[in-house]
Amino acid sequence: MTLQPTFEGRTPEQCLNVHTDSHPDITGCQAALFEWAESYDSKDWDRLKQCIAPFLRIDYRAFLDKLWEKMPAEEFVAMVSHPHFLGNPLLKTQHFVGTMKWEKVDDSKIVGYHQMRVAHQKHLDSQMKEVVAKGHGHGSATVTYRKINGEWKFAGIEPNIRWTEFGGEGIFGPPEKEENGVAADDQVMNSNGSSEVEERNGHVVNKAVEVRSV
């Protein structure tokens, strides 16, 4: 068997540190990954709650310059489901996962390295006929999985954006206009994906959603 190249200083043997008796674990991680991607793209936030760990490591430094070492699950769901983020009903997405490799850290933690393409398409209104913004990211993601009460859960992500299509200006933030024609409020995330945040009483505050810096 040809060994894969070294990844982030790890030897090929370490990157392939999943043996035959670990296949049920990998199947469990794949199931959690599938549920995560499908819950995002279908905007089924109850489904998302079922596949994530109680605490997650969210490393969004690639596009938000923010890192949360231990974000509670309820805060993670609130953040990604916000109408100015993936919860916008006018925003269509697909989180497409390509080939992958696995590293078993211990009996309750596995790290997956996944090729990713994430497509975003934002529409003008609920008719979903006119597209006002597009942005597709290509790269990879490092995903952490943890075994909770015998079941593997999605427990963190670190995207690595290699290149993008269409720029993505205007993807995140409020709709171009409200259904009644009234202009929406100021955009929360700019074209680079960085958010307007401030530090207040030891908390990182986003005008779209408050998440605790831990």
Swiss-Prot record:
The active site is at H95, H120. Disruption phenotype: Impairs the production of monodictyphenone, but still enables the synthesis of intermediates until emodin. GO terms for molecular function: lyase activity. The keyword Acetylation does not apply. Substrate binds at Y40, Y60. InterPro entries: NTF2-like_dom_sf (IPR032710), Scytalone_dh (IPR049884). It comes from the Eukaryota. Keywords: Lyase. The keyword Transferase does not apply. Pathway: Secondary metabolite biosynthesis. Pfam families: Scytalone_dh (PF02982). Its EC number is 4.2.1.-. GO terms for biological process: monodictyphenone biosynthetic process; secondary metabolite biosynthetic process; xanthone-containing compound biosynthetic process. Belongs to the scytalone dehydratase family. Scytalone dehydratase-like protein; part of the gene cluster that mediates the biosynthesis of monodictyphenone, a prenyl xanthone derivative. The pathway begins with the synthesis of atrochrysone thioester by the polyketide synthase (PKS) mdpG. The atrochrysone carboxyl ACP thioesterase mdpF then breaks the thioester bond and releases the atrochrysone carboxylic acid from mdpG. The atrochrysone carboxylic acid is then converted to atrochrysone which is further transformed into emodin anthrone. This is Scytalone dehydratase-like protein mdpB. The lineage of its organism: Eukaryota, Fungi, Dikarya, Ascomycota, Pezizomycotina. The gene is mdpB.
